[in-house]
């Protein structure tokens, strides 16, 4: 199920700089919640395994089934929206998982995703948006009045932007030390840019839902791109400083304007 991944020199350099000792594992299958047998297999590769759980009180009454399962004691790594490369500090040492769904991805971009995960796992940040919002997730749902699935998608995007505010300067600094990874980060941003300028019109005409637009815009924040109103307000020191409180206030004000 799990095999230690051979890392190219630049990705090994990122690990040495940010997450010394972290394991990077290739996975034979896709998974989120690990069955007991696979969790036991994983436990043989690490010194300790301590699954995280969260209070039920943090959840609004209606949430996707996977999120309700996530707050329990089952060992879960990655959730819908987290992509094929995920990380966890529920183990000692921490682990970056490269899941089977990444097969066929461009090599440079996949190596960047692994390097990005190594940078993120070294931060003192939750590995899922629920650990970021905590009880404010209920407030986010109340502020937007979106469906449970759309609220989930918006929360993923908002936390993605928050992480990006902490990581993008690291990626910018790789232009000389790790130029291949830096170029992959830049290329991913350039592919996003054409979509961003039309986002307000797409949302206004119903061609793109607000949560989907937020997903694109918040990815733009991670890449240091110019993002349109109202998402530009997330690319601020205020968001970096005030976190979930800021995100909920932004959502409430934004949806009040959308309802006018």
What are the residue ranges of the model-derived segments?
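Post-HEXXH active-site segment of zinc metalloproteases
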Residues: 108-109, 122-157
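Short amphipathic alpha-helical segments and their helix-coil junctions
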Residues: 92-98, 140-147, 230-233
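Pan-zinc metallopeptidase signature
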Residues: 178-260
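Active-site scaffold of zinc-dependent metalloenzymes
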Residues: 54, 59-114, 118-128
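Short acidic alpha-helical/loop segments enriched in Asp/Glu that coordinate divalent cations
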Residues: 127-133, 172-185
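An active-site-proximal "capping" alpha-helix that borders the catalytic cofactor pocket
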Residues: 152-171
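A metal-dependent hydrolase signature that marks the N-terminal structural subdomain at the beginning
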Residues: 1-78, 257-259
